[in-house]
Amino acid sequence: MSVEEQFKTSAEQVKKLKSSPSDTELLELYSLYKQATIGDVNTDRPGMLYLKEKAKWDAWNGRKGLGKEQAQELYVKKVKELVEKNGLA
């Protein structure tokens, strides 16, 4: 299975986890997913009143320069860890 196919499968598996990942894990997944699908952050940083959006933006921006395939590989690895930890519903 190609990295792209593994990535798509992992994106579906995340929706089926028995328990929700921690906020830190969710930010990691979000940043890797955005980097893998869009690339480097392409929007302005949200203002200080938008705490959740700012945290997501910061996490994504922290992946700046990471290639698509590498981001996909890291995403697949993280999802595998979460599946082992939480199981699938």
Swiss-Prot record:
Binding locations of an acyl-CoA: 15, 30-34, 52, 56, 75
SUPFAM superfamilies the UniProt entry points to: Acyl-CoA binding protein
Keyword rRNA-binding: no
Pfam families, sorted: ACBP
GO molecular function, one term: fatty-acyl-CoA binding
Keywords, ordered alphabetically: Lipid-binding, Transport
The keyword Disulfide bond is annotated on this UniProt entry: no
InterPro entries: Acyl-CoA-binding_protein (IPR000582), Acyl-CoA-binding_sf (IPR035984), FERM/acyl-CoA-bd_prot_sf (IPR014352)
PROSITE patterns found in the cross-reference section: ACB_2
ACB domain location: 3-88
GO biological process, one term: fatty acid metabolic process
Domain of life: Eukaryota
Function: Binds medium- and long-chain acyl-CoA esters with very high affinity and may function as an intracellular carrier of acyl-CoA esters.
Family to which this protein belongs: Belongs to the ACBP family.
Protein name as it appears in the record: Putative acyl-CoA-binding protein
Provenance organism: Hypsibius exemplaris (Freshwater tardigrade)
